[in-house]
A protein has these predicted regions:
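Specific aromatic-rich, kink-prone transmembrane helix
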Residues: 117-137, 146-152, 166-169
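Transmembrane helix irregularities
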Residues: 97, 112-114, 120, 150-161, ...
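Perimembrane helix-loop-helix junctions
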Residues: 165-203
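Transmembrane-helix motifs of polytopic, lipid-linked glycan transferases
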Residues: 52-81, 124-128
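Transmembrane-helix signature of polytopic, membrane-embedded enzymes
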Residues: 69-100, 120, 136-144
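Membrane-lumen/periplasm interface segments of multi-pass, membrane-embedded glycan/lipid transferases
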Residues: 1-24, 29, 33, 216-285
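Juxtamembrane segments of multi-pass membrane glycosylation machinery
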Residues: 15-59, 77-82, 104-108, 264-278
Length: 285
């Protein structure tokens, strides 16, 4: 409880690390550890200096944009071959603009790091998955399936909520599994192995990491976060759903006659309770 923490801090003259997970007398970062392993630690070891979070966020965004372009191209090549080039450009712009990276570029802080890295790996994974069966040889098909699954699995080391993107494998590989039998079947055991193995390996590592810190393989530590509210009592409240639906889907953008022409929307509402929300720039629809 933030009120209790602030009271103890005032009475005892001590402080605490804001937005850190506090468990069993120790502080932890509840974000995934992959950004540290990819950027911060190697840079520190190589230069003895601190890595710039801003630089990491922009690297993630740049790679995401590259794979977004390739992803749309792969989708059109596989299912919509007659789409004009202009439509391809427009669809790419829509995907990039609606991904949330514009907000991350506006505020490339520590919170944006795991989110943009998760987006980067998810988009790369989707591209390699879709383009896998464009390859003429089974070896290259297997390589792309493996890389795609590895990228999708690594999302768990960034922002675990983005693992929901892995469920896109169902429509993407529906024909391969149930009609062509080129995946998840006896005759395609090699492709099945390289498709599943990255998930298994990454899951074992992440679960061990969770267990070592919080005593549970499924506990990422978010509930122990020292933030504005008591995360252990936050729970699910149906009263927040209408506001969330309106904000994410129906909220109109605020438009100005000055660059960048849009501003954050007003999240004022009549909900009788605490709502924690980031600034938004309008709903999807």
């Amino acid at each position: 409880d933030k009120g209790e923490r602030d009271k103890v801090m005032r009475e005892n003259g001590v402080g605490y690390k804001w937005d850190h997970a506090y468990y069993d007398g120790k502080y932890y970062v509840y974000f995934g550890a992959l950004p540290v392993l990819m950027y911060y630690m190697p840079y520190k070891l190589a230069t003895e200096a601190d890595f710039s979070t801003y630089a990491g966020v922009f690297i993630n965004i740049s790679v995401f944009i590259i794979f977004a372009v390739l992803f749309v191209r792969a989708v059109l090549k596989r299912w919509f071959k007659d789409i004009p080039f202009v439509s391809y450009i427009l669809l790419t712009q829509v995907l990039i603009s609606s991904s949330g990276i514009i907000f991350a570029m506006r505020k490339p802080d520590l919170y944006a790091m795991p989110i943009t890295m998760a987006l980067m790996f998810a988009m790369a994974g989707l591209y390699f998955w879709i383009s896998a069966y464009e390859c003429k040889t089974k070896v290259m098909q297997g390589v792309r399936l493996f890389v795609g699954s590895l990228c999708m699995a690594l999302v768990a080391g960034c922002r675990p909520q983005f693992l929901v993107s892995s469920f896109l494998a169902v429509p993407l590989f529906w024909n391969n599994v149930f009609k062509e039998r080129t995946l998840l079947s006896k005759k395609s055991w090699a492709h099945t192995l390289v498709f599943v193995l990255p998930y298994v390996v990454v899951a074992v590592v992440v679960m061990w990491y969770n267990y070592a810190r919080f005593g549970s393989v499924f506990d990422f530590g978010a509930n122990y976060n020292l933030t504005t509210n008591d995360m252990t009592r936050r729970g699910f409240n149906i009263g927040r759903m209408p506001l969330g639906f309106f904000t994410y889907f129906l909220q109109l953008p605020v438009v100005y006659a000055k660059f960048p022409f849009v501003a954050a929307t007003n999240l004022s509402n009549s909900y009788m309770g605490v709502t924690v929300a980031e600034a938004m720039f309008g709903g999807i629809l």
